[in-house]
């Protein structure tokens, strides 16, 4: 990480929102010597990185993000002593399992050589696709987790990535001979919330696969709240303060400060700061587009899920969707504003490897599917049908469940507009101008946006907040 010279005169910063990006921004500002206050509307800090008893007492569920390849692989988080504040990463033997209808599962192995062997006829093609970036992860991660366009620091590496990343997932999948490998890649690419025939869907698929081999897909012991608690603990050591149950409806409600960083999406920024921003910038924010939402279920279980494919118990994360064609149809339906009859389901079973999540012998599971933004459709039956498809009898072991519609999610985290967990659709049009061509800067010199609606986008990595704070500090240092 690049150091920033400390200011000789004491300056104050206010940060709105205590999600990972807000806390990252606050830490960067505090490291530069600013007095920092963070204001959080909810009673618990963390935004999408919170852990709560959502079903039964003693069962700990992640409200938002649960599995963190970009958390453990974040250049900024890796530069902080978060382990000293209780953050411990837990890895399952394999990062991901993708069960199929024949009673087997295709596994995304952690080691590339194991992946080559397990993917059989496609093993070599898979390694060709991801090996350069896995082997040079420490160079690759900072490249992909910074604002674009940018002059690459490792041009040959990024040129090679770009040759594949500009393709759709559908095109990349044609490199594989086996339907099993195509299905595996479809599930990875579906994290894009794009149709799998769209440009950038292939890039997201690669960006999910590469860290699986480079750093894994771990969970924090005790839940995602552990990430938040570690960030808050380190911020407190630097002198920063987090004020929970402190919603900010207008910048006028903030104490006097030199700079404000907003871990909010464009819609909230308009409401909070619109009066301080010029009309042209406000119109740009109004044109920002949100992506599909999610319908989420948290489960308290009597026992572990009995998967037909026993190897599924080796992974924390499962992708439930069958073949490439089925997943592609599901994502295309959602992208077109419809609900998939057989939705692609993402499922995490962290308590298999972290006993602190549930009472002895019991388990927690987290699952969601994609839906149109703002959907009011109850997807419970369809999600459970997909789980039962690969784990018959699943419903019989459910002690309690809690569902979250798009509106429910937004009520608990205002950044999840219409249930969008990515901070806005990440298509070609919104890849560079996110949320505008100015990215973190606004039309007001002392106001910045630092949420997942800025580069590099969604995920618990803190890099949006890191880059926004660096931008603000550079401007302050130059008196601009």
Where are these regions (language model features)?
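N-terminal glycine-rich phosphate/pyrophosphate-binding loop and immediately adjacent elements
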Residues: 7-135, 425
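Rossmann-like flavin
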Residues: 101-200
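Conserved FAD/dinucleotide-binding core of flavoprotein oxidoreductases
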Residues: 114-117, 267-273, 300, 359-386
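Helical element adjacent to the flavin cofactor pocket in flavoenzyme catalytic cores
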Residues: 207-248
């Amino acid at each position: 990480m690049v150091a920033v010279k400390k200011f000789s005169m004491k300056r104050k910063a206010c940060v709105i929102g205590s999600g990972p990006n807000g806390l990252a921004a606050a830490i960067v500002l505090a490291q530069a010597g600013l007095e920092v206050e963070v204001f959080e509307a909810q009673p618990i800090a963390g935004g999408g990185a919170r852990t709560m008893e959502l079903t039964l007492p003693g069962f700990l569920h992640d409200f938002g993000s649960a599995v963190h390849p970009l958390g453990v692989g974040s250049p900024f988080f890796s530069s902080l002593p978060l382990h000293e504040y209780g953050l411990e990463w837990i890895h399952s033997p394999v990062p991901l399992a993708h069960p199929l209808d024949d009673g087997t599962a295709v596994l995304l192995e952690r080691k590339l050589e194991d992946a080559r062997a397990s993917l059989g006829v496609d093993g070599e093609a898979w390694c060709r696709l991801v090996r350069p970036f896995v082997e040079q992860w420490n160079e690759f991660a900072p490249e992909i987790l910074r604002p674009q366009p940018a002059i690459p620091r490792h041009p040959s590496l990024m040129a090679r990535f770009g040759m594949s990343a500009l393709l759709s997932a559908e095109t990349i999948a044609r490199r594989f001979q086996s339907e099993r490998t195509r299905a595996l890649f479809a599930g990875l690419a579906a994290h894009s919330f794009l149709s799998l025939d769209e440009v950038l869907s292939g890039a997201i698929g690669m960006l999910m696969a590469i860290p699986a081999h480079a750093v894994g897909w771990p969970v924090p012991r005790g839940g995602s709240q552990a990430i938040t608690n570690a960030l808050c603990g380190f911020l407190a050591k630097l002198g920063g303060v987090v004020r929970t149950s402190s919603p900010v409806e207008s910048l006028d409600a903030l104490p006097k400060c030199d700079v404000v960083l907003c871990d909010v999406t464009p819609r909230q920024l308009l409401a909070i700061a619109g009066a301080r921003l010029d009309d042209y910038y406000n119109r740009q924010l109004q044109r920002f587009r949100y992506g599909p939402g999610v319908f989420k279920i948290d489960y308290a279980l009597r026992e572990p899920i009995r998967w037909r494919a026993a190897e599924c118990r080796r992974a924390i994360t499962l992708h439930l969707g069958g073949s490439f064609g089925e997943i592609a149809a599901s994502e295309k339906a959602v992208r077109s504003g419809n609900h998939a009859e057989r939705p692609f389901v993402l499922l995490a079973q962290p308590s298999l490897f972290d006993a602190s999540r549930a009472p002895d012998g019991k388990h927690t599971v987290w699952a969601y599917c994609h839906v149109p933004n703002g959907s009011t459709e109850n997807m419970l039956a369809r999600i459970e049908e997909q789980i039962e498809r690969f784990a018959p009898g699943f419903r019989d072991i459910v002690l309690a469940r809690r569902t979250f519609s798009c509106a429910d999610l937004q009520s608990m985290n205002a950044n999840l507009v219409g249930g969008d967990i990515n901070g806005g659709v990440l298509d070609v049009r919104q890849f560079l101008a996110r949320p505008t061509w100015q990215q973190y800067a606004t039309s007001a010199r002392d106001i910045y946006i630092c949420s997942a609606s800025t580069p590099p986008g969604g995920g618990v990595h803190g890099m949006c907040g890191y880059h926004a704070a660096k931008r603000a500090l550079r401007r302050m240092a130059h008196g601009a």
